[in-house]
Amino acid sequence: MSTIEERVKKIVVEQLGVKEEEVTTSASFVDDLGADSLDTVELVMALEEEFECEIPDEEAEKITSVQQAIDYVKAHVKS
């Protein structure tokens, strides 16, 4: 079983079409990985699907980096 961090990074690579080595925990979706607003919405939807959870819009707006996505999933998803 992959770790949450590995699963989140895999989703980011697939959704944003970036290289795996570019997806560091400190990477910002917009500033570092070139995501636009539609990309970030699709990314949140992919996270919801992967981790079988719902991320409210007000929470989704706060998830702007890889680490924030990992932290959110760890805090809100039962493993």
UniProtKB/Swiss-Prot annotation:
Pfam families reported in the protein's UniProt record: PP-binding
Assigned GO CC terms: cytosol; membrane
Keywords of this entry: Cytoplasm, Fatty acid biosynthesis, Fatty acid metabolism, Lipid biosynthesis, Lipid metabolism, Phosphopantetheine, Phosphoprotein
Any GO molecular function: acyl carrier activity
Keyword set includes Cytoplasm: yes
Pathway connected to this protein: Lipid metabolism; fatty acid biosynthesis
Annotated Carrier domain residues: 2-77
GO process annotations (BP): lipid A biosynthetic process
PTM comment, free text: 4'-phosphopantetheine is transferred from CoA to a specific serine of apo-ACP by AcpS. This modification is essential for activity because fatty acids are bound in thioester linkage to the sulfhydryl of the prosthetic group.
Subcellular location: Cytoplasm
Residue numbers bearing the O-(pantetheine 4'-phosphoryl)serine modification: S37
Domain of life: Bacteria
Residue ranges that the Swiss-Prot or TrEMBL entry lists as coiled coil: none
Role, per record: Carrier of the growing fatty acid chain in fatty acid biosynthesis.
Family to which this protein belongs: Belongs to the acyl carrier protein (ACP) family.
Protein name (record): Acyl carrier protein
Source organism of the structure: Xanthomonas campestris pv. campestris (strain ATCC 33913 / DSM 3586 / NCPPB 528 / LMG 568 / P 25)
UniProt gene name: acpP
